[in-house]
C-alpha cells in the first residue's frame, strides 16, 4: 500500500506500507523503492492494512480541520494568509495545511487531491476499525458525517479541499 497519490509516485516520494511474509519483504521493497521514498514493514497484512487506515485517519482529520479553518476564517472575515502564517509557526502546521493553503489563498481549491467520496469511503473503514475506541470512534463518525452530507449534496466527485468554497454541506 502506498501513501499519497500518482504525482508523488512519479516523483518517487511515496511512503510504502508493507504487510506480508518477512521473507518477501526485501523483494517487494526493491520494487516499491522505484516509486517510494521509504517503505515500512508492519508485519502481517492485517497490521499493514490497519496502519494504512490509521495513517489516513490522521491525514483526513487534519485535512478536515484545515478545511473548516479556512471556512471559519472566511465567515469571520479574517485574513487567511495572515492566519496561515501564524498557524505555520505553531502546532497547527501540517502537511494538510501545506498542501491546501498556498493554492487556496489564491482561490485554487484543488490542493488536496482526494475526493469527497473516497474520503467518506475511507472514514467508513476507519470508523469500523476504531469502533471499540470511544473517542476515536466519535471523531471518525463526526468527520464521516461531514463527507456524507457533502456527497448527498452532490459534491462527492469534488476534491475535499474544494469544499472550502462551498457554503454549506
Protein language model features and the residues they cover:
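Helical "substrate-binding/catalytic lid" subdomain
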Residues: 46-162, 166-169
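Rossmann-fold dinucleotide-binding core
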Residues: 4-56
